[in-house]
Amino acid sequence: MLDSLYIADGHHRVAAVTQYLQESGKVNQHGLMSLVMDQDDLLIKSFHRIISGCGEPNVEVYFNDNNIAYRSVSLAEQPTVQSNESMVMTSSGCFVFSLGETTTAMNAVEKLEVTRIESGIIRGLMGIENTSHDARISFMRGDTPLQKMKWIIDQGECDCVFVLPANSFDQVEAVADQNLTMPPKSTWIEPKLLTGFVSQQFD
């Protein structure tokens, strides 16, 4: 018997069922359909940030002004991006950067690269305050090839793309242990189950 589980995917569905049962005063003895697996069988990928309608950012000036370590890279050389690094792609080039070490004063969400990039660079450089509701930002799943993202930029379909590192299971676990919430579109979970259409009647 397991005392508790971490929900890797489908939080909104679990929350919706929980809210319904609480408001209706009913108890579902059968629970809800779920798949339980070991964390070693779970693959966590990132979601990348696509920025449009802001104009091409001068990332080098921003990095220099804010003492952010970065380097220019060529996609043809298949650059390696470490787990504590991110990449920003513009029509002028591709840059790998690091925001440096986190501090013990930060909570688990504040330590995430996605949080630091959204609250720092995307807000400070692009002027996007709310990444959940701003039409200028969209998201692309983490297994998208870098060349495809660069092609989107070269076609003029967006201003830049922030290529984010995937969060580790330990990071996701730490967020849950602190009773916090992962930022929207910060994890792409695999495997995706091919279950077809499944319905469960609660009423």
Give each language-model segment a name.
Residues 1-203:
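Surface-exposed, charge/polar-rich loops and edge strands
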